[in-house]
Amino acid sequence: MDINQESLELHYQMHGKIEVVSRKKIETRKDLSLLYTPGVAEPCRQIAKDYEKSFELTRRNNLVAVITDGTAVLGLGDIGPAAGMPVMEGKCALFKEFADVDAFPICINSKDVDTIVNTIYMISQSFGGINLEDIAAPRCFEIERRLKELCDIPVFHDDQHGTAIVVAAALINACKVTGKKLGKLRIVINGAGAAGIAIGKLLISMGFGNIIMCDIHGIILSLIHISEPTRPY
């Protein structure tokens, strides 16, 4: 059985890769009164008086929203939000297994930047962080920029920053192994999308100077050779 078929059968068996589990068993009437009404009113009052207490009195301190519009899912492309759900669930499972961070998959059925930004902003007070995932360029740049301005919690675009961090780490270690200097390397970035641009920005900030970036038309020699929507980035 190949890996695709094996994965499909596993997904049929599991009916999803994540679940919500109560951190306190509700076994008695007092448990119910403490975790829900009437006792829960007091934490609500405290948060109403001091917004920051929402990070102390709720699980918000450890909740991350993993959000996509389904337009750039893995190597599959624009397959829609529902079809992107298995990937979002998988990312949430990684958060939990490797960092003990509770993450929720959220798939937004819109390609409109304003709608996506407003939707995420309106639910942001339920979370401690936002992880943008598999949103096509150049729309992803604008969404991230605006959310960072609006939200009071960290906003991270995995396809940009996660990829850039991994590439930078690999190059640093490669330099250690080969004894070469960071600024002496000649680097080719094959692709000028979300990941490629983010990689270029990070490497330049770290002192890597000799960088050649290519897109579907070949080597990019000036801004004229970059597609109009991507130029500002």
Predicted region positions:
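Conserved acidic E/D residue at the C-terminus of a beta-strand in Rossmann-like folds
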Residues: 213-215, 228
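N-terminal ligand-binding/catalytic initiation module
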Residues: 1-155
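A glycine-rich, Thr/Ser-enriched phosphate-binding loop motif common to dinucleotide/cofactor-binding enzymes
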Residues: 157-173
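Glycine-rich adenosine-cofactor-binding loop
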Residues: 65-75, 167, 183-204
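Single conserved hydrophobic/aromatic residue that forms the stacking wall/gate
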Residues: 224-233
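Conserved S-adenosyl-L-methionine
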Residues: 205-209
